[in-house]
Amino acid sequence: MINRITDNKFKLVSKYQPSGDQPQAIEQLVDNIEGGEKAQILMGATGTGKTYTMSQVISKVNKPTLVIAHNKTLAGQLYGEFKEFFPENAVEYFVSYYDYYQPEAYVPSSDTYIEKDSSVNDEIDKLRHSATSALLERNDVIVVASVSCIYGLGSPKEYADSVVSLRPGLEISRDKLLNDLVDIQFERNDIDFQRGRFRVRGDVVEIFPASRDEHAFRVEFFGDEIDRIREVEALTGQVLGEVDHLAIFPATHFVTNDDHMEVAIAKIQAELEEQLAVFEKEGKLLEAQRLKQRTEYDIEMLREMGYTNGVENYSRHMDGRSEGEPPYTLLDFFPDDFLIMIDESHMTMGQIKGMYNGDRSRKEMLVNYGFRLPSALDNRPLRREEFESHVHQIVYVSATPGDYENEQTETVIEQIIRPTGLLDPEVEVRPTMGQIDDLLGEINARVEKNERTFITTLTKKMAEDLTDYFKEMGIKVKYMHSDIKTLERTEIIRDLRLGVFDVLVGINLLREGIDVPEVSLVAILDADKEGFLRNERGLIQTIGRAARNSEGHVIMYADTVTQSMQRAIDETARRRKIQMAYNEEHGIVPQTIKKEIRDLIAVTKAVSKEEDKEVDINSLNKQERKELVKKLEKQMQEAVEVLDFELAAQIRDMMLEVKALD
């Protein structure tokens, strides 16, 4: 039995006070939520402190909150910020726990079966368990998640019902406790004590919860009664304190009791017989043999161990769901009255919409060729309409809300004023005739002031030709294309900020991690060619790249002004006018953002024995690459420990790149 604490409050800790138009945005959002409004949009310009506004809203409405970002890196940044704002509350992180993931697939054209291959990040697995257990134990919970939160997770009821609840004075034999722990997928290991394991020493049982990484619990028996429970350091055994009540959550999210397991196995066997009959009728004997062999092995594992690799493919039977019924997800672990905030909603909602179809087409291939039972199709992400059915109240957060969000609500709350006083940049349109020489003059003017320039083109060839030309003209320039790996990309951004070069040319400069305060000029070539990066939203986002510098300026090179251009220019001018009026009224002088340039030498460069001499990774031999991977792995763990998930994700990608050279 879990005693859920429902009366605790969110406590926001910050040296800041709401400023600019934050107070009115906070007040409107809170009033609308308390008034029962289902959906609203926070349309906040880049750099206006949207995360702080979100934190203020959470603390005032006091509801469990799910914040969804469109990738792990952004989720990590938000998690770090919310942890700082709410040190006394449960701020949790829920993303895919795979460092590397190759889904199970089959390619009929080459008769290639690709087995599921993955590397699970133990730290992220711990954080996922921490998130689900926190949601069942308390009310003051913020979970920052990627879109993996709409994937199947197992039944929250089974998860909660499987909790082993212990307290001093409870009559339970030691052996009964050991059996209970094994039932919820804990593993006995008296030597290697890790998360999800327990060890036994006489009348003492030590349990290492799946949601912890340093602290375990020591349960001491007197006969068939628990004498006392103490929290201890897992490594040293040092006692940290007495515990009145201990709830041990399952070591896996896919858990079921013996009765339900027998029912599930019977259903799996019945479905197997049905599908074998279909294959035999169609003359697919190879597929029938394959399916029979795989499924019978899985059934044996479920019967003996209560678990098998790929157990999630049988989740429909284990959860007792009907065919086509949506799976349980993280959203089902929240109470009914919870709040959802979608960060960068113009990107995230598109991802939520697209998840189902991609998963379905891959799984259908596996079913058709006898690698999985048809019920595996119900181990899937939610459809968008299924996601919508979970929404009680939602806030879409974006500088450029998408069509979907605008269809959901007419309530749009603006946040335009930046705490730094920075204005949206001035935007002008210049003709394409003589554009390169015109741009060269603008770049030279920026170089003299030690400022940087972004140039965005539409084609790879244009970007390459432009880069070559500017190099001939003596400009320090680099081209960032889609083939550049994380390792090099991180280095390029750092070198741009340090002034190793002055101009960065690219096609898509909207990806995360490309916010550079030193950039005072953004040049948009072919601005009148409508498309993904030249529509209104794309242009506004690109213009925002110059909004972190007090000298920010944008030049669009075009022969005609498209509707998208005009709307982007008008919107930027409207915001700029409001910002200037506010600054004038309050005597604020815009200040360029001062952002520390993180030293990435240790992370991005292989350093030879002569400490200062940097070497190219491609020139390293196999042993040196192996040593570098070890170093990077250590640095990744250090980054995770200090909750710097952005850096950890970068290092992880670098490790994969170094490993790929072998």
Swiss-Prot record:
SMART domains: DEXDc, HELICc. Keywords: ATP-binding, Cytoplasm, DNA damage, DNA excision, DNA repair, Excision nuclease, Helicase, Hydrolase, Nucleotide-binding, SOS response. Residues 626-661 form the UVR domain. One of its GO terms (molecular function) is DNA binding. ATP binds at residues 44-51. GO terms for biological process: nucleotide-excision repair; SOS response. Gene3D superfamilies: P-loop containing nucleotide triphosphate hydrolases, UVR domain. Residues 435-601 form the Helicase C-terminal domain. InterPro entries: Helicase/UvrB_N, Helicase_ATP-bd, Helicase_C-like, P-loop_NTPase, UVR_dom, UVR_dom_sf, UvrB, UvrB_inter. The keyword Cell inner membrane does not apply. It is found in: Cytoplasm. Residues 31-188 form the Helicase ATP-binding domain. One of its GO terms (cellular component) is excinuclease repair complex. It comes from the Bacteria. A motif (Beta-hairpin) lies at residues 97-120. The beta-hairpin motif is involved in DNA binding. Forms a heterotetramer with UvrA during the search for lesions. Interacts with UvrC in an incision complex. PANTHER family: UVRABC SYSTEM PROTEIN B (PTHR24029:SF0). The UvrABC repair system catalyzes the recognition and processing of DNA lesions. A damage recognition complex composed of 2 UvrA and 2 UvrB subunits scans DNA for abnormalities. Upon binding of the UvrA(2)B(2) complex to a putative damaged site, the DNA wraps around one UvrB monomer. DNA wrap is dependent on ATP binding by UvrB and probably causes local melting of the DNA helix, facilitating insertion of UvrB beta-hairpin between the DNA strands. Then UvrB probes one DNA strand for the presence of a lesion. Belongs to the UvrB family. This is UvrABC system protein B. The gene is uvrB.
